Amino acid sequence: MSERQLKAESGTEQEAVAALARLQRSPIVDPGGVTFVYQGAADAVNLRCWIHGLPASQPFERVGEHDLWVLRVELPENSRIEYKFEVVRDGQEEWILDPLNPLQAADPFGANSVAQGHGYRRPEWTLPDTAARPGTLEEIALASTALGDDRHVVVYVPARFRRSRRYPLLVVHDGLDYLRYASLQVVLDNLIQRLEIPPLIVALTQSPDRLVEYAGHEGHARFVAQELPAQLERDFNLLPGPAARGLMGASFGGVASLHAAWCHPGAFGRLVLQSGSFAFSDIGHHRRTTTFDPVARFVNEFRRRPGRPAERIYLSCGIYESLIYENRSLVPLLRHHGIEVRYEEVRDGHNWENWRDRLQSALTWAFPGPLWMVYE
């Protein structure tokens, strides 16, 4: 909605300003897109958002001489984006959350404002359900020879856990972040209650140096595939065999999951890879920072000889991510080698709420519960 459109729809400029002031919300959502509104003194206002292929900074229009700024952005239905406002005053730039938008998404770096396109709804299974009995969180410690230090791992234990039963195991990279920012415990409680997945033991790992340990690190792969499962088998009664063992991770955690399964074939039969940072350079430089160099070396080798790291792999990626091309390229490669693949592209970016919204599809593919065994 530009200044011209505002005047056309609201009459005079003064009427347009008054109408927007009364709304007291931003953005304004319609089937074709969203209109961002900022009220306040500024020399310039820019939208800072992360949609691959579009400018990272888009300028607002000022409405006349008023301290009112608007920006119309086309946004397909069911989209979701995270953003901040860049406010320029007296030559100083400040990035702020949208003051008129209560919707925010937290991540390890802080928080962003959230714009939900027309038709987007947060999945109801990501919200607490009083009918779902909550699982518990326990902490275990183990000395890792592979990593040369002690590691503390939080373990999700499902409600109604019994020592006499055996359970599948899911190991989650950045597991505490999945708890904090992707509602993982709520999702597990709900999906187990609804029989969409079986009761699982879920090991939530966290690395002190994830950009190193998750980037094709042999010691980390050995820890995840050998040391951690061995400890969990002593502490809990786990089902044997790769069909009952899974790895999950997002971004670099997706790389770590694929790498560990590839280095230790037969250890895991199920992988959940969300927005994996699968940079490769076998057909040209990866054009990313040097942090990605060890990732590219692993992915190059994986593309040459993928083998069969798992029986089933779930992949997802947001179409607003620069990683969309790398993730797409994996799908035919995996299928060519006899792996069952579920792949989803969504109108979202590289963020935790994107990964949260995919958890039902991911977990029911990796570990279908009684409900899916009946209806699929």
Regions found by a protein language model. Give the residues of each.
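Non-catalytic cap/lid and distal C-terminal segments of serine-dependent acyl enzymes
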Residues: M1-A56, V63-E376
